[in-house]
Protein backbone atom coordinates (compact mmCIF):
# COMPACT_ATOMS: atom_id res chain seq x y z
CA UNK A 1 0.00 0.00 0.00
CA UNK A 2 1.52 3.34 -1.08
CA UNK A 3 0.18 5.17 1.99
CA UNK A 4 2.23 2.91 4.26
CA UNK A 5 5.53 3.58 2.48
CA UNK A 6 6.07 7.19 3.39
CA UNK A 7 7.11 9.00 6.53
CA UNK A 8 6.75 12.67 7.37
CA UNK A 9 9.23 14.55 9.55
CA UNK A 10 6.74 17.40 9.83
CA UNK A 11 3.33 18.17 8.34
CA UNK A 12 2.33 21.82 8.03
CA UNK A 13 -1.32 22.43 7.20
CA UNK A 14 -3.07 25.59 6.04
CA UNK A 15 -6.74 25.14 6.88
CA UNK A 16 -10.06 26.91 7.51
CA UNK A 17 -12.33 26.73 10.54
CA UNK A 18 -16.11 26.42 10.37
CA UNK A 19 -17.03 28.00 13.72
CA UNK A 20 -16.27 24.85 15.69
CA UNK A 21 -12.92 25.89 17.14
CA UNK A 22 -12.82 29.63 16.46
CA UNK A 23 -15.74 32.01 16.89
CA UNK A 24 -16.60 35.68 16.28
CA UNK A 25 -15.35 36.64 19.75
CA UNK A 26 -11.81 35.81 18.61
CA UNK A 27 -11.34 35.16 14.89
CA UNK A 28 -7.81 35.98 13.74
CA UNK A 29 -6.81 36.14 10.10
CA UNK A 30 -4.03 33.62 10.71
CA UNK A 31 -3.29 31.48 13.75
CA UNK A 32 -0.54 28.91 14.40
CA UNK A 33 -1.37 26.16 16.86
CA UNK A 34 1.39 25.80 19.44
CA UNK A 35 -0.77 23.16 21.13
CA UNK A 36 -3.90 21.75 19.52
CA UNK A 37 -6.64 19.22 20.04
CA UNK A 38 -9.30 18.03 17.64
CA UNK A 39 -12.72 19.55 18.24
CA UNK A 40 -14.23 16.16 17.39
CA UNK A 41 -16.81 17.48 14.95
CA UNK A 42 -17.71 15.19 12.06
CA UNK A 43 -16.10 12.45 14.21
CA UNK A 44 -12.55 13.48 13.26
CA UNK A 45 -10.65 13.09 16.51
CA UNK A 46 -13.75 12.11 18.45
CA UNK A 47 -12.08 9.08 20.07
CA UNK A 48 -8.55 10.51 20.25
CA UNK A 49 -8.33 14.31 20.10
CA UNK A 50 -4.54 14.46 20.42
CA UNK A 51 -2.58 16.11 17.61
CA UNK A 52 1.21 15.78 17.76
CA UNK A 53 2.14 19.45 17.56
CA UNK A 54 5.85 20.17 17.67
CA UNK A 55 5.73 23.12 20.09
CA UNK A 56 9.35 24.20 19.58
CA UNK A 57 9.01 24.09 15.80
CA UNK A 58 5.67 25.90 15.91
CA UNK A 59 7.09 28.70 18.08
CA UNK A 60 10.13 28.97 15.83
CA UNK A 61 7.85 29.22 12.81
CA UNK A 62 5.82 32.01 14.47
CA UNK A 63 9.01 33.97 15.24
CA UNK A 64 10.31 33.62 11.68
CA UNK A 65 6.96 34.50 10.09
CA UNK A 66 6.75 37.63 12.27
CA UNK A 67 10.34 38.47 11.25
CA UNK A 68 9.19 38.31 7.62
CA UNK A 69 6.59 40.98 8.39
CA UNK A 70 3.50 38.78 8.41
CA UNK A 71 1.20 39.32 11.39
CA UNK A 72 0.18 35.95 12.75
CA UNK A 73 -1.37 34.95 16.06
CA UNK A 74 -0.75 31.75 17.94
CA UNK A 75 -2.71 29.56 20.31
CA UNK A 76 -1.76 27.24 23.13
CA UNK A 77 -5.35 25.86 23.14
CA UNK A 78 -6.28 25.54 19.47
CA UNK A 79 -9.47 23.57 18.90
CA UNK A 80 -9.03 22.12 15.43
CA UNK A 81 -12.32 21.49 13.66
CA UNK A 82 -12.91 19.24 10.65
CA UNK A 83 -11.48 21.89 8.32
CA UNK A 84 -8.12 21.17 9.94
CA UNK A 85 -8.44 17.54 11.02
CA UNK A 86 -10.07 15.99 7.96
CA UNK A 87 -6.81 16.28 6.02
CA UNK A 88 -4.84 14.61 8.83
CA UNK A 89 -7.51 11.94 9.21
CA UNK A 90 -7.11 10.76 5.61
CA UNK A 91 -3.39 11.46 5.24
CA UNK A 92 -2.47 9.66 8.47
CA UNK A 93 -4.92 6.74 8.35
CA UNK A 94 -7.23 8.17 11.04
CA UNK A 95 -4.35 8.76 13.48
CA UNK A 96 -4.25 12.55 14.00
CA UNK A 97 -1.11 12.20 16.12
CA UNK A 98 0.79 9.93 13.71
CA UNK A 99 3.31 12.61 12.62
CA UNK A 100 4.57 15.90 14.07
CA UNK A 101 2.27 18.60 12.75
CA UNK A 102 1.91 22.38 12.75
CA UNK A 103 -1.63 23.61 12.14
CA UNK A 104 -2.11 27.05 10.60
CA UNK A 105 -5.60 28.53 10.53
CA UNK A 106 -6.51 30.78 7.63
CA UNK A 107 -9.80 32.52 8.40
CA UNK A 108 -12.06 31.89 5.44
CA UNK A 109 -15.44 32.07 7.16
CA UNK A 110 -15.78 35.30 9.11
CA UNK A 111 -15.47 38.91 8.03
CA UNK A 112 -12.87 40.28 7.55
CA UNK A 113 -11.24 37.56 5.51
CA UNK A 114 -7.52 38.10 4.83
CA UNK A 115 -6.60 39.20 1.33
CA UNK A 116 -5.01 36.87 -1.17
CA UNK A 117 -1.87 39.03 -1.00
CA UNK A 118 -1.57 38.53 2.78
CA UNK A 119 -2.26 34.81 2.49
CA UNK A 120 0.44 34.40 -0.16
CA UNK A 121 2.83 36.39 2.07
CA UNK A 122 2.09 33.95 4.91
CA UNK A 123 2.75 30.93 2.69
CA UNK A 124 5.99 32.50 1.47
CA UNK A 125 7.14 33.26 5.03
CA UNK A 126 6.39 29.68 6.11
CA UNK A 127 8.26 28.27 3.12
CA UNK A 128 11.26 30.55 3.78
CA UNK A 129 11.28 29.33 7.39
CA UNK A 130 11.33 25.71 6.26
CA UNK A 131 14.03 26.25 3.62
CA UNK A 132 16.36 28.33 5.75
CA UNK A 133 15.65 27.23 9.29
CA UNK A 134 18.52 27.69 11.73
Say what each PLM segment does.
Residues 1-134:
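Active-site histidine-anchored catalytic micro-motif
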